[in-house]
Amino acid sequence: MRNISIIGAGQAGLQLGIGLLNAGYHVSLYSRYSAKEILNGSILSSPSMFNDSLECERKLNLNYWDTVCPKNKTVTYTLSQSNKTEIALRWQGNTIHPYQAIDQRLKFSCWIEEFIQLGGQLIIQDVHIKDLSYIARQQELTIVTSGKGEISQLFPINETRTIFDKPQRVLCCLYVKDMLSVAYSQGVRANVIPGIGEYFITPGLTLTGTCEMML
């Protein structure tokens, strides 16, 4: 078996595709967007990657940003008193190894270019369930790594692992520069305000340099 298709050009699909190319396989990668479209698109998330995940990237020489990305070392949790501005509880933990938060537009666009340079075939297509049979017939193995869009319906919720059947939050994400530093924290800060919501701040790296990722 030497010819493989991967559907989804995200964290899993790109690493798998590049790893398979390095091992001598012929790989076709299906992506809804090109590298340029991803780079110029909207924020995808506020991702924190911890050491085990970062080591997987390093083994594939995909750790392009190790020297420029903030090295986060703590996780701080703060709970406010209900209907008040005073702090009710705060605790902080230290990680054994630094962790990173890199804008996925930067990461995925660079990884797609690396995939192409290694000889991979990038196919720009929004794959639907009806397309899978045709794609599977063209290759010896087809792997789905996408969890978004129609194709996610292939994977029903595992009710033994979750009691929820819909999102529990309405999310807003933005990146800001030149935010005032906080002396007590060198990493993500999770703030809970009862009755209002949650607010996460993570030092990270975006297209224009270091930033604070707010969720």
Predicted regions and their residues:
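Residue-level detector of anion-binding/catalytic polar loops
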Residues: 26-27, 63, 121, 141
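Glycine-rich FAD pyrophosphate-binding loop
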Residues: 5-9, 18-42
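Charged, glycine/proline-rich intrinsically disordered loops and linkers
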Residues: 71-73, 78-95, 183-191
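N-terminal Rossmann-fold NAD(P) dinucleotide-binding loop
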Residues: 13-14
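Predominantly flavin-linked oxidoreductase catalytic cores and closely associated redox partners
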Residues: 110-215
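Well-ordered mid-protein domain cores that form the structural environment of catalytic cofactors
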Residues: 94-115
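Short, glycine/charged-enriched secondary-structure capping and boundary segments
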Residues: 20, 43-44, 156-160
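N-terminal FAD cofactor-binding segment of flavoenzymes
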Residues: 37-82
